[in-house]
C-alpha cells in the first residue's frame, strides 16, 4: 500500500511541474517563433529624419483544403490536398521620392492576401 502512495506522489509532482511549465510559457510564442505578425515596419535604408518610409513585413499563414473533384480531373498529377499561400502586402500606400530621384511606395496599411510573386 505504501508503494502506491509513492507512485501517486511522484505522478502528482511530475504533473504539477508540467502544468507549471506550460502555464509559465507566453501565449502562442511557440507556434510562431521568430516570425512576427504582418504589420508596418520602418525601412531604415530609405527613411530619413522627419520622413520615415514604411514597408509591410511579417508572416501570414497558408491554408490547405481538400481538392474539389472537378479540379482533380484536370490535374496532370492529381493531389488530394490543395494549399493556398498568403503574403504580407500593402493594402494602401503613397508614392514617395527618396535619395533625390528614386520613387518608392510608402505603405500605410497592411494585410494578408494572395501571393502573386513567389521566390524561386
Curated annotation (Swiss-Prot):
GO BP: cellular response to hormone stimulus; developmental growth; follicle-stimulating hormone secretion; G protein-coupled receptor signaling pathway; gonad development; luteinizing hormone secretion; negative regulation of organ growth; organ growth
Keyword hit for Transmembrane helix: no
Subcellular location: Secreted
Chain positions carrying an annotated carbohydrate: 80, 106
SS bond list: 35-59, 38-88, 56-110, 60-112, 87-115
Major subcellular site: secreted
Record note on quaternary structure: Heterodimer. The active hormones thyrotropin, lutropin and follitropin are heterodimers composed of CGA, a common alpha chain described here and a unique beta chain which confers their biological specificity to the hormones: TSHB for thyrotropin, LHB for lutropin and FSHB for follitropin.
Function statement: Shared alpha chain of the active heterodimeric glycoprotein hormones thyrotropin/thyroid stimulating hormone/TSH, lutropin/luteinizing hormone/LH and follitropin/follicle stimulating hormone/FSH. These hormones bind specific receptors on target cells that in turn activate downstream signaling pathways.
Record protein name field: Glycoprotein hormones alpha chain
Gene: Cga
